[in-house]
Amino acid sequence: MRIKKYKTTLSILTIGAAVQPLLSKEPAKHPNILVVMTDQMRADLCRREGFPLNTTPILDSIAQRGCWFDKAYTAAPASVPARTSFLTGRFPKATDVRSNHNLQDAVYLQDMYDIMKKAGYRTALIGKNHTYLKADKVDFWSEYGHTGKIGKDKTTGDAAFDTYLGSLSMYVNYDPSPFGIEQQLPYRMVDEAKDWIKEDNKLPFFLWFSIPEPHTPYQTCEPYYSMFPPDRIPPVHTDMHTLNEKGEIYQHMHDVMLLAHPDFPGKIDRARSVYYGMLRMIDDQVKRLIDHLKEENIYDNTIIIFLSDHGDYVGEYGLIKKGVGLSDVLSRIPMIWYGPGIKANQQASPAHVSIIDIFPTLCEIVGEEIPLGVQGRSLWNLLQGKAYPVEEFESIMGEGGYGGAYYTAKDDTDYEREGCLNIKKGSFDSLNSWTQSGSLRLLRKGEWKLIYDMTGYGELYNMSADPSEVNNLYNDARYNDIKTDLLQHLLKWEIATQDPLPVPRKRYHFKRNPHNYLFAETKYSK
């Protein structure tokens, strides 16, 4: 068993009105694979999900010509656990990576890059890594972080922009960026991707194109800064007054944020405006990348996957960033598949899926065995419009917290000594001992969502009537049957994802469904 570092990227493919409805033709034996991943991108802030602002027209057009999911969930709403799960197809409870600070501890047998190399692909990472993956495992490596490109290979203008990013203390620039679009990270990354794709067309490529935005620091240039003015954006569904209903740990998050930025409540709409502008900037750069695939005549043989590692509050509950809980604004992610063999469907798939399902799906696409220890299910039959067991995808699980007991107001709350607050610099880390304490699980099934923790405390929400998750129905006797059903599904998920690693030496053969289905055809015969 090996331990590696790697980060996942979302593949986005779009061309607006020029994109033709995709026929469900079989892909070539080795289609190119482009995974475009964003960082901290909300799933619901787009028109295909009913949001009134036109933040992602290109992605929306791709989604409606491919297959997209509105019940896709991350494995855990933090970068390193989510990205590690993306690469390995394993939940954080199996990878042992439950925080952003132990990426080197990842446990798995083979990951996405191992399989792509085995299948004959040339591989690349362009963008944010934030996993165990290292450059010597990838054919082409160009790493970016939230303060710019890592390394010295950049122009004077790019270096100046990266210095500017570092000056923002992972917060918000309420003014337009003083730099043009050519210095923005997604633009520079597209330039590098175009060069790498063009240099060799003899082998199929696997590219993890991992955009560091719209993660903080929120910032963008014109015209994106002015595209969604604060006085023309829709109101948030919740605010800081909702914190009393969400619980003490949410209040901790709000307290530490206000210590760093006491003026934030009065500027929340401008922060949201900047975030929406970043979404549109990302969308435009995805189009540049897609246009290049067409120019190189490889668009029709490229499978594109678009996703994010997790979401962001973006003003809900009076917060930004991520940190507390498993609300959908953090845990639900965008997921789009487009390319040869994938059946077009304008409506969202009813299937409940996870970030861990991407790796086994790619294994099946390239004709390689799904490695032992992978806990995700292949979506390939579903994506092709073929028959698949509906019960396999009628619910999905997610995780949160790094363990231990909850910190409360009775405990020491010296945020600066903890290292999660620097008042002088105006910075705060939303992933800290308070917000990450405890262990949580979520279970989504249809319009219902369950959150359950290690103390037995539960939350039950009707997501159709209460998408902001403020009306907890867990202790309402009228919903006992629904609660029991979701608890049974959660228990089933916990048992079915028991980790088979390490492999028992010279003993026992581990039986698996060929698509790695967990629940279909697994019952004992009577």
Which functions belong to the PLM regions below?
Residues 327-328, 398-475, 524-526:
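C-terminal, low-complexity/hydrophilic appendages and adjacent surface loops
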Residues 25-31, 38, 42-43, 68, ...:
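Long, internal low-complexity/basic segments
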Residues 27-31, 43-48, 53, 153-187, ...:
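Active-site-proximal cap/lid insertion segments
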Residues 33-41, 116, 128, 206-209, ...:
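A short aromatic-rich beta-strand->coil structural motif
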Residues 56-57, 86, 128, 135-137, ...:
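Polar, surface-exposed loop/tail segments
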Residues 85-183, 189, 400:
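Catalytic-site neighborhoods of secreted/periplasmic enzymes
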Residues 47-83, 89-90, 94, 117-124, ...:
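Short, structured active-site-proximal loop/turn typified by the sulfatase FGly-forming signature C/S-X-P-X-R
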Residues 70, 119, 132-172, 217-263, ...:
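Core domains of carbohydrate- and sulfate-ester-processing enzymes
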